[in-house]
């Protein structure tokens, strides 16, 4: 008799249904916290080092996009890992420190110039690949947040939509990337006061947009993003 279980799909190692979600679906419930099921499934198929990858910073008007890759130690996973947006700032900082001590962590960026030269999606993927390549151990399977495998990534991989809510490794990567980028924007805020980057991390808040109009565009602003582009274009028209 065939038993219940996750259904395998062809191509990259993966499942038609989240391997930890199928049981919840049978009882009409939804899993709300990430677990290690994707990682264990990959290991069961021969993977030895499974990395989770996520990026932070697609939406801001200023600053780089940052990515992190994390290989967790199955025997030493910090408690409280979740989507970085669901974890408070103090808890994120504590988890960041724990992960840096107990996991293989790599952090990378794609610059504002790269964002403007390519586009934010391509720049995000560039940062992801850099983070993967920066790991101390050679990951032989990658779990990627989202629905697209970055161009140039040759390691066997699996995309997971809302992966930071479903995979502990991706959740760890999301926390590392966010804490790293938030701290970077705090440093940049000291160099460029008035834009509120220490609190808005470069996102288009009312304070940030008003400061753009009053103080102008800095070298850290993304000129390809419409609010910044419009200010530059308006200034050019006024000078013509």
Tell what function each PLM region has:
Residues 2, 8, 14-240:
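RNase H-like, Mg2+-dependent phosphodiesterase core
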